[in-house]
Design a protein with these regions (language model features):
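Hydrophobic alpha-helical transmembrane segments
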Residues: 1-84, 88-91
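Central hydrophobic cores of alpha-helical transmembrane segments
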Residues: 31-34, 184-188
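Alpha-helix N-cap/helix-start motif at helix boundaries, enriched for small hydrophobics
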Residues: 113-117
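Secretory targeting signals
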Residues: 38-43, 61-79, 118-183
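Perimembrane helix-loop junctions in membrane proteins
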Residues: 45-55, 95, 99, 146, ...
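Transmembrane helix boundary and interhelical loop/hinge segments in multi-pass membrane proteins
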Residues: 87-106, 120
Length: 188
């Protein structure tokens, strides 16, 4: 019974955090910029593959070239995702400290673990939204490429999701040790 209440509390905290996250323009702006960056990279790499085909070159390992190759779209995402995640995680706990609502949370029957897991769960959902943006381009590629390598792309997406979660955990930690959002973002 007690575990069930902790899970309900964690889900309630995650829902509140997701609502506040998506009411702010920062989460939407990061999502749009992330999608734009992926779209530009994908259009360039996919266009190169089409030009090679038009010039009569034999195409091989198209999935590798588009997604994980030297000019693929997953390596730049891995290099730049650390710029996006701190913008979201910087306010997870810092907002609570600045507004003074952290005192209310500590005095309520909500446990610290439920607060932290709820905030991390909201970042898991946001990370899934980022991966869903990438999934649109993966779906387009799966439809247009004849021998699409699903295992390569899905394992790359899983790795990217886990990287987002690792950065989210670091950002949540940095946000919990300082009440200033800028310090939390720079520390992440």
């Amino acid at each position: 019974m007690k575990v069930n209440n902790n899970i309900k509390t964690t889900l309630r905290v995650a829902k509140i955090e997701l609502n506040s996250m998506f009411y702010s323009p920062v989460a939407w702006l990061v999502l749009v910029i992330f999608g734009f960056q992926i779209g530009m990279s994908f259009a360039e790499v996919f266009g190169d593959q089409l030009r090679y085909q038009d010039m009569g070159y034999e195409l091989w390992q198209v999935t590798t070239g588009i997604f994980t190759g030297m000019r693929g779209i997953l390596p730049p995402i891995q290099r730049y995702i650390y710029l996006y995640i701190p913008l979201i995680t910087m306010g997870l706990m810092s907002r609570e400290y600045q507004s003074g609502s952290i005192k209310l949370l500590y005095s309520s029957p909500v446990k610290n673990t439920s607060i932290i897991f709820g905030k991390f769960l909201s970042m898991m959902v946001y990370g899934f939204a980022l991966i869903a943006v990438l999934g649109v381009f993966v779906l387009f590629s799966a439809i247009t490429i004849v021998n699409f390598d699903y295992s390569l792309v899905l394992s790359g997406m899983l790795g990217l999701y886990l990287l987002i979660l690792a950065y989210s955990a670091i950002g949540l930690f940095m946000s919990s040790i300082t009440k200033y959002q800028v310090v939390a973002a720079i520390g992440t």
